[in-house]
């Protein structure tokens, strides 16, 4: 099916934003295709839960606190790398001081029905916020519409080397959250991004928990920041 003119404009806008942040270029742009159903286990889900976020060192020295937003997604893709199910969550905007820890009860979990084939991509983006009000509205909208798995009307195909930022954008777009809710990302400081790849074929009947430990560190205007993020993926059965 050919893209409509409006949809093409949106895709171009997303790709432009992605290029602004990406440390490496994708070999393929995001494209949309006619929706097709993917078989899923009706009694099995995969749940994403943040366990902790710790500020070891801050990006902002003058204010002695960073205004932080964490955005995360579960994206199910089929064997052709088409997005077939998405769930999104967000946390913030929170003022984090050096040494401060945010624990699991402060983060909303998200979940998907486990597909028979393909893979699950769990992606996280940590940003230091410039526009507080706009970011708060984004967090509210993502959490209002994105917590449970959704099958998009138009599937989005990911390129082979998409960044975590690109994957989260695709997941938000597939969930119908739209460009207006995520356009603030081009004004914020990206502190870290990561995607964990979990092929369905590699899942074990005995292993139910998949912990992910991440370190985000770097330098911005001579300020060295350092954050540690821990989350887990859990396979549940009803």
Label each region the model flagged.
Residues 32-238:
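N-terminal amphipathic/basic membrane-interacting segments and domains
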Residues 25-28:
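Bacterial signal peptide processing site
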Residues 20-23:
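C-terminal motif of bacterial Sec signal peptides marking the signal peptidase cleavage site
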Residues 2-12:
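Bacterial N-terminal signal peptides that target proteins for export
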